Amino acid sequence: MKLTCVVIVAVLLLTACQLITADDSRGTQRHRALRSDTKLSMSTRCKGKGASCSRTMYNCCSGSCNRGKCG
């Protein structure tokens, strides 16, 4: 019973800390452009038109690989 109470109190404390930290960090992002570029590069992992490709790996943005080049 004591262990259950300790776990419940710990979870409530951690939740409260998360909420307090989230409120304090609003509007304090310093390098917005850098972050958005990083997100963009992480989300687009496909290759553009004319890049080398393999038929076994579908890594072209267009979805087609003809003669080793993205189409």
Curated annotation (Swiss-Prot):
The keyword Cell wall biogenesis/degradation appears for this protein: no
Superkingdom classification of source: Eukaryota
Main location: secreted
Residues bearing PTM Cysteine amide: 70
This protein's UniProt keywords: Amidation, Disulfide bond, Knottin, Neurotoxin, Secreted, Toxin
Tissue distribution: Expressed by the venom duct.
Database matches in PROSITE patterns: OMEGA_CONOTOXIN
Record's subcellular location: Secreted
GO MF annotation list: ion channel inhibitor activity; toxin activity
Disulfide bonds: 46-61, 53-65, 60-70
An example Gene Ontology CC term for this record: extracellular region
Note: Found in injectable (milked) (IV) venom.
Function: Omega-conotoxins act at presynaptic membranes, they bind and block voltage-gated calcium channels (Cav).
Family of the protein in this entry: Belongs to the conotoxin M superfamily.
Domain free text: The presence of a 'disulfide through disulfide knot' structurally defines this protein as a knottin.
Protein name, per record: Omega-conotoxin-like CnVIIF
Organism: Conus consors
Organism classification: Eukaryota, Metazoa, Spiralia, Lophotrochozoa, Mollusca
